[in-house]
């Protein structure tokens, strides 16, 4: 292994089929993104969109889970993060299927003629408050550059009638996001409440919305069992990705 590769692998996360460097990204690879990338429904999709791609994690997870014919667009506003996402994708088995765009999603959407079967986002959710150490981290954490109404509007403009728009959010913020989405004409179709263990209340929620009305399926996912090892359900969801699972 070359010295440059060794340094790269100390600044990222190694999965079974790909590596994500994230040292130049404001937000690092974490459980939220891994949950969303493993959970989002991919059956029958032909084209996917990752809004706020960051390191490219979600785009890479979707590429692993979908057929070779599926194309994925990853849009990231911050130039350093977009450049690192492109590098991660270039080193993956799916470089020809993922297109990275350094752009403001609100402007990028207006130039598109295609529609997406699956749109995915791990969006900012903090309101403006304590300053972050860098403008890049503030952009990744706060809803100042893309608030939730704007995000929902962008997704609505480019989703297919039967498509899904999937997000992961803290539980309480997710409830507010759901109310907002419903008021804008979206329909909640899938909801998974995520708790660290059986004794704790859910701290994250995975949500899938669609323009098309239909039954909403809800469940609960516990990350760790009584022995503090990963639960069977969490293992089943993520074992295709985690290196030592």
Swiss-Prot record:
Compartments where located: Cytoplasm
Top-level lineage group: Bacteria
EC number: 2.1.1.223
Main localization, broad class: cytoplasm
SUPFAM superfamilies: S-adenosyl-L-methionine-dependent methyltransferases
GO cellular component entries: cytoplasm
Pfam families: MTS
Alphabetical UniProt keywords: Cytoplasm, Methyltransferase, S-adenosyl-L-methionine, Transferase, tRNA processing
Primary enzyme class: transferase
Reaction equation(s) it catalyzes: adenosine(37) in tRNA1(Val) + S-adenosyl-L-methionine = N(6)-methyladenosine(37) in tRNA1(Val) + S-adenosyl-L-homocysteine + H(+)
Record GO biological process: tRNA methylation
Its biological purpose: Specifically methylates the adenine in position 37 of tRNA(1)(Val) (anticodon cmo5UAC).
Membership in a protein family: Belongs to the methyltransferase superfamily. tRNA (adenine-N(6)-)-methyltransferase family.
HAMAP family in alphabetical order: tRNA_methyltr_YfiC
Protein name, per record: tRNA1(Val) (adenine(37)-N6)-methyltransferase
Organism per entry: Escherichia coli (strain K12)
